[in-house]
């Protein structure tokens, strides 16, 4: 536990390496607070839809947003639950984005393949009895749109984002299956 705070500080400061440094933070919020439990509705024990996300403080230089949701507490290492890109720089990502490669409504975005092997959002679903998991809802603000096909991988997305991140923010939600 005593190593967690320095690690988080290092990770946030280290984000400058992806974007060339100097990017500002955006505030990300939802129906749950930072370090609070995610309502079951947004998990495999509910209807498994993405929660709404509110993003405050987006730069006027923003061309698009990227969302990456992952669980670093997964038994086999960090598990990716959702990747989406080419989202217009809007302040609200609505709940229940369709699980398809290219989405036009309720908001435009392109989605990639998560670690369940599916396109779109699949919510928290930690192994029963594995304890509390931390789900990181990361929002990257880019100075460009990305030329990636629907269904691309997280690795392809991260490579395409290099040098284009101008802002970053995240919200951490908790979930446990007993």
Curated annotation (Swiss-Prot):
Chain segments annotated as transmembrane: none
Signal peptide: 1-22
UniProt KW keywords: Signal
Listed InterPro entries: PEBP, PEBP-like_sf, YbhB_YbcL/LppC-like
Superkingdom field: Archaea
Keyword set includes Signal: yes
NCBIfam families linked to this entry: YbhB/YbcL family Raf kinase inhibitor-like protein
PANTHER family assigned to the protein according to its UniProt record, in alphabetical order: PEBP (PHOSPHATIDYLETHANOLAMINE-BINDING PROTEIN) FAMILY PROTEIN, UNCHARACTERIZED PROTEIN YBCL-RELATED
UniProt record similarity statement: Belongs to the UPF0098 family.
Identification of the protein by name: UPF0098 protein PYRAB11530
The organism of origin for this protein: Pyrococcus abyssi (strain GE5 / Orsay)
